[in-house]
């Protein structure tokens, strides 16, 4: 996303200063919410929550709000996009190494999947992108959080679809309001898209974009609908957005 672009544009000394400024804001939020920082990854981090998934989601929302409240000095005037992805599943944590060089290691298919989701969060404009499996572990998810179904990812090895949620409590106020106002139309559009009713879905995404012209997910769906609805074999297109 934009944050990675900013990091790559800086000289090495400025780059590490910016990364450390960001991590100094992120790590306390993870610690205070009961998370464990497993590793620092590029310009971000991987955190593990072993008990309550709502703590992980609450921390994700807080991370976005924390960074928005205090811009790192090295970012300058450039727009700073920050994205959090959440998945849930089993993980093995152990110590690896030899002699005096030992470190903790986490082995889990879900950490790899979470990393796969990171560019998708930026692509579809989700500050917090969460899998349906993780959301399903939170009681009253739909009532406690503001979220919309973005669509589906095909899990190739498991031959199943995983729902993705854009939890927009982590967005800035105007974006949050616009996503809530257009949520019903957007989700109806996604449902029609998944039913291969591309023309009708297209009309709904146009309505969404009239109200929220910066909606990246709606723009992507509109592009797909414009491409598909004229085709003779349109029903053969997949209902999912990405394949893992």
Label each residue range with its predicted role.
Residues 18-33, 62-70, 211-213:
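Generic non-transmembrane alpha-helical segments
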Residues 70-71, 109-132:
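Catalytic/regulatory signature loops of cyclic-dinucleotide turnover enzymes
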Residues 238-244:
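Flexible, glycine-rich loop/tail regions that form catalytic "lids" or insertion modules at the edges
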Residues 29-55, 69-109, 133, 158-159, ...:
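Catalytic core of nucleotidyl cyclases, primarily class III adenylyl/guanylyl cyclases
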Residues 91, 122-200, 206-207, 212-224, ...:
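Cytosolic regulatory/linker segments at or just downstream of nucleotide-handling modules
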Residues 1-5, 44-47:
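Active-site-flanking beta-strand signature of metal-NTP-handling nucleotidyl enzymes
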Residues 4-27, 31, 38-39:
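Conserved long alpha-helical elements within nucleotide-processing catalytic cores of c-di-GMP signaling
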Residues 3-6, 96-104, 174-175:
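Short hinge/gating elements
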């Amino acid at each position: 996303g934009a944050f990675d672009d900013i990091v790559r544009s800086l000289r090495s000394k400025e780059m590490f200063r910016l990364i450390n400024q960001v991590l100094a804001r992120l790590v306390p939020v993870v610690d205070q919410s009961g998370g464990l920082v497993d590793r620092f990854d590029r310009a971000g981090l991987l955190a593990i929550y072993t008990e309550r998934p709502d703590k992980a989601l609450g921390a994700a929302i807080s991370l976005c709000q924390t960074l928005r409240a205090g811009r790192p000095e090295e970012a300058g005037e450039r727009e700073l996009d920050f994205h959090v992805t959440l998945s849930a599943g089993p993980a093995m944590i152990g110590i690896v190494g030899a002699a005096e060089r030992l470190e903790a290691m986490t082995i889990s298919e879900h950490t790899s999947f979470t990393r796969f989701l990171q560019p998708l969060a930026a692509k579809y404009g989700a500050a917090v992108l969460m899998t349906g499996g993780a959301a399903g572990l939170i009681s009253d998810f739909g009532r406690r959080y503001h979220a919309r179904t973005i669509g589906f990812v095909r899990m190739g090895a498991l031959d199943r679809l995983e729902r993705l949620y854009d939890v927009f409590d982590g967005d800035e106020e105007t974006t949050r309001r616009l996503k809530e106002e257009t949520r019903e139309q957007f989700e109806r559009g996604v449902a029609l898209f998944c039913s291969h009713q591309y023309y009708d879905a297209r009309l709904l995404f146009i309505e969404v974009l009239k109200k929220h012209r910066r909606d990246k997910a709606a723009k992507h769906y509109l592009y797909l609908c414009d491409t598909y609805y004229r085709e003779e074999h349109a029903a053969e297109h997949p209902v999912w957005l990405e394949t893992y």
